[in-house]
Structure formats: C-alpha cells, structure tokens
C-alpha cells in the first residue's frame, strides 16, 4: 500500500516566518559601514557643551574635521538643510581636503561626509548660517522690527560695532539646542510674539560661558541642572535708548549678554543656592563667584557681571556677558 506523503508542519513564529520569506529575528541585521569621524574639541567650546557653530554665508569654517583611515582627498562633504530650512541651491559635494565652507544660504544645516559609497552625517554639531546685517532695511528684516544700532554707519572694529548678522528663528527651529542646557527660544526678544520669522544676534561665547558657570556651580557642590533666561538678545527697538542714551550700547543688543538664574525645580525663581532658607540677591552672588572663577580660568570670556535683587516683577538674577573687559555692579 502506498503511504500518503506527509508535509512537515512548522510550529512557532520563526520557522513560519522563514517559510513566508521573512527575516529571521534571531539573525542580527548587517552592520552599516560608517566613517570614523573626528571633530576638534574647540568645536564644542571650552565647556564641551556647545551644539552649534555660527557662520556667515560662504565663510570658511574653523572646523578641521578628520576621517580616520581615509585619505583627505577621498572624502567629500555636502550640506543638508534642517528644521525647515529652504534651499534653492543645487545639491553639490565639495572636497573635504580644501576646507569646509559654510553654505551660501542662511539657515540651519548639517554636514554630511562621503567616502566612496559610505556616508556619515555629523549629528553632534549643527551649523547655523546667519542672515547678513545688510538684510536689515528700514530697521526691519521681513517685517520683524530690529531698529537701529547707535554705532550703525560708523567704521568700528570693537565690541560695539553692529553684529555681523542674525539667526533666523522660526516655529520649526526655536527649540533647537544651542548647548546641552540652553535652547534658541530662550534668547529671543520678548516682544513681537505673533511675528515670524524672528531674528536674534547671538555670540556663542556667551552660551559657552553660561555652561561653564553651571559646571563651576556643580563643582562647588551647588546643583545646577537648569538655567532660566529672563532676557537674552534684545533688539535696539525693544531696548530703547534708556536714560541719557545709555541703553543704546547695552550688551543685550549685541547678543553677548543674558540675565539668568538657576532654576532646577522650574518654578520660575532662583533656587536657594547658599542654603540659608531664603531666595534673595545672596543667591545671585553665589553665581557671581562661579562666574568670577570661570573668567579667571578662561580670560577670553571675561565680561560684565551684575547682581540684581528681587522686585514685584521678578526674583533675583545675575547679568552675565562677554564684552571683553571686566565690569561689575
């Protein structure tokens, strides 16, 4: 008698998956080849916490990127737009050996390298290309009021020459990290809330210094996990002339000053940094000690430092800037 042919019956997900032509989950996927890219420490600031580099259009970047095991002439780079940055430029690759030039268009960009068929995006660092100062016409850029700088139209090369340009801020990029603990939206002028895009002058040395102050506080045994920014960049239009015209030279209008406090619990007020059970100007004075220590260690970040007491409108805070010379009040 001829016995019937019995087909094997498979039980379990894996064998059935193989019958259906699906990948076996027990087998690891192939490893994607990557480039061993090295970024210089200077790209992340003295704090090691910066996450962006700012540049003017077509500016040569001081960013000596190297790729281990690959000759410089074998690596090409191109720019990828981020956060809704619009580009009309053709997709072009450039030789890394010739140095890295910033994109020709303002916006937020990421660097991508390619060696043969292997591609690698540099995700640790974002390049922000400023809108040139010359784009400001009649005190505005795209309907956003900036105003006029007191030194505008004069030939100056000091800390009071107008900023080189402005970062364009949109609803899509305002939450971008500038550093480990600070975001772009924290430094936007507090008026014209309904107008987009907005524009911010920003000196990354300030961001680096604020991160270093947080590090110093932690080294002093004072927890500093979160920094609130009451005021960062202020447009000249918003800041006004002040008494006797003094505010026309405010460091806030140049993008290298901020009024800040440590706010670990996120309640909107300075924390009790000195542990005396009160929140007052003495806590801001603790931050001054940390800022003084940072300046002693990093003289290139020297600047102003002012302690402010509480008012009915706000709690105590400290002003920190990187104007290039020591000033205290």
PLM features: residue spans?
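Hydrophobic membrane-insertion alpha-helices, especially the h-region
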Residues: 8-21
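Beta-strand-enriched, solvent-exposed domains that form extended recognition/catalytic surfaces
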Residues: 25-137
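Secondary-structure boundary elements
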Residues: 118, 218-223, 299-300
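Compositionally biased low-complexity segments at domain edges in trafficked proteins
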Residues: 137-169
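Extended, low-complexity, intrinsically disordered C-terminal regulatory tails
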Residues: 209-244
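Catalytic cores and adjacent binding grooves of peptidoglycan-active enzymes
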Residues: 248-329
């Amino acid at each position: 008698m001829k016995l019937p042919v019995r087909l094997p019956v498979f039980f379990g997900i894996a064998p059935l998956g193989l019958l259906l032509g699906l990948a076996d989950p027990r087998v690891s996927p192939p490893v994607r080849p990557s480039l061993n890219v090295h970024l210089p420490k200077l790209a992340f600031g003295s704090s090691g916490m910066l996450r962006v580099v700012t540049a003017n259009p077509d500016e040569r970047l001081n960013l000596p990127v190297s790729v281990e095991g690959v000759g410089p002439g074998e690596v090409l780079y191109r720019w990828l737009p981020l956060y809704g940055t619009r580009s009309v430029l053709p997709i072009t690759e450039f030789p890394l050996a010739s140095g890295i030039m910033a994109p020709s268009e303002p916006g937020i960009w990421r660097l991508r390298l390619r060696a043969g068929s292997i591609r690698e995006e540099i995700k640790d660092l974002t390049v922000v290309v400023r809108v040139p100062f010359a784009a400001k016409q009649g005190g505005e850029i795209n309907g956003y009021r900036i105003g006029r700088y007191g030194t505008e139209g004069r030939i100056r090369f000091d800390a009071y020459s107008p900023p080189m340009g402005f970062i364009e801020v949109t609803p899509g990029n305002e939450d971008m990290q500038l550093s480990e603990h600070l975001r772009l939206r924290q430094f936007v002028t507090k008026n014209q809330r309904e107008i987009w895009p907005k524009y911010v002058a920003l000196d990354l040395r300030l961001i680096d210094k604020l991160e270093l102050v947080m590090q110093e506080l932690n080294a002093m045994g004072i927890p500093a996990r979160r920094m609130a920014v009451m005021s960062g960049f202020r447009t000249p239009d918003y800041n006004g002339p002040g008494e006797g015209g003094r505010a026309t030279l405010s460091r806030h209008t140049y993008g290298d000053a901020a009024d800040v406090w440590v706010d670990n619990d996120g309640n909107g007020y300075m924390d009790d940094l000195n542990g005396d059970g009160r929140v007052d100007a003495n806590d801001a004075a603790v931050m001054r000690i940390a800022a003084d220590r940072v300046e002693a260690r990093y003289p290139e970040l020297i600047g102003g430092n002012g302690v402010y007491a509480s008012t009915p409108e706000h709690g105590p805070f400290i002003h920190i800037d990187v104007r290039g010379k020591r000033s205290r009040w």
